[in-house]
């Protein structure tokens, strides 16, 4: 199945492979290229010594805004931790920019977008720069769980790269198999698109891009949903520690996005290896995966852009309403 994506005026197509499980059909992301086994081994294993890395995020508005939520590691023991920070940051940066742009446009560019007040940069984490020592929502334990999933994905991609060179690869891809959304070995998911979910008491709460979930059920209910634990959430979202039911299809989309971001992170690793204190890797030569290509539909850009902006406006309004209610309660 081919999908079209539209990002900052650029269209690109992506082919998704499908397979069945439990009477349902799922689509999963496949890399558009593979590296050699040596590079995957380098990306999977620890470095000989921890690496200090300057990301250059210090003056970025999104970085200050999410200071209460996210701290990059001070040093990196392995590439998996580096990729972990890369993909968390990519999610948060994209979410901040999309919401800010959408709300600014809705307000005709007047003032700060709702929910994006400058004073919020020094929020509950007490760290306006985002990289200090104050406690943040994404705890070391949550980030370790993400890093473990990154390592597992790198190992799986290495195996897939080797299998793709064998005659049986296409046959294996068509077999029925458990999707990552339900795989007992895959528990941690990062929210990629905004979702509205219902708590056990019937009230609704929101999950937004960058929130972290831990799946605690393996068998879908009658609504094709499974229970998840909110492991890390942003202001105004479902509280950390809450349990909600999330559609299996939504979890699968989260994993697809996660896998795609890991590939982007591996690409950044390949660009930066041997520079600024990062150890050199084996050859970074890539070979294309023919069946991962899809031609983009150039007519969908405006529709995707409008849908993203509408969702961003609605989410920002909900966060502002939650903040107003909280302030009203403090005045009583």
What are these regions (language model features)?
Residues 1-137:
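Low-complexity segments
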Residues 69, 196, 201:
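Second-shell loop/turn segments in exported
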Residues 132-196, 218-220, 240-244, 248-324, ...:
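SH3-family beta-barrel domains
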Residues 178-180, 201-207:
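Short, surface-exposed secondary-structure edge patches
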Residues 198, 214, 222, 234-236:
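Short beta-strands and strand-coil junctions in structured, solvent-facing domains, enriched
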Residues 204-219:
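Conserved beta-strand/loop element in small beta-rich adapter and peptidoglycan-binding domains
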Residues 224-232:
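SH3/SH3-like beta-barrel fold
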